Amino acid sequence: MNRTEQKQQAFQFIDSHRDEMVALWQEVVNMEGGPHEKPGIDLVAGRFRQVLDEVGAAIRTVEFAQAGNMLIAELPGPIATPGVLFLGHMDTAIAAGAIARQPFTIRDGKAYGPGVLDMKGG
């Protein structure tokens, strides 16, 4: 499969799963997880762990006492295939209480809420 076909396949997948992707996006944006808020960050990590488990990833959680836990996940695939690394954080720069003031919303085709354009947005 050439790159054009790969891109078309990726866009078709996104188009066919758009509603569930937006629902997950809304769910994690509406989870409090500001700086140094371990319980909220761990909640986000737990939700992403569920998603990764559903797609067959091998997942390891690295627990921290005073910071949000870290997920390490590997998706099965041929060893000879070039890999792809996704790296991100699950907290936001917004302090606790932001969700009550500005929950995830979509207006005029644009998404709003803490973290929508940061790592909670992918």
Language model regions located:
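Active-site alpha-helical elements of protease catalytic centers
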Residues: 117-122
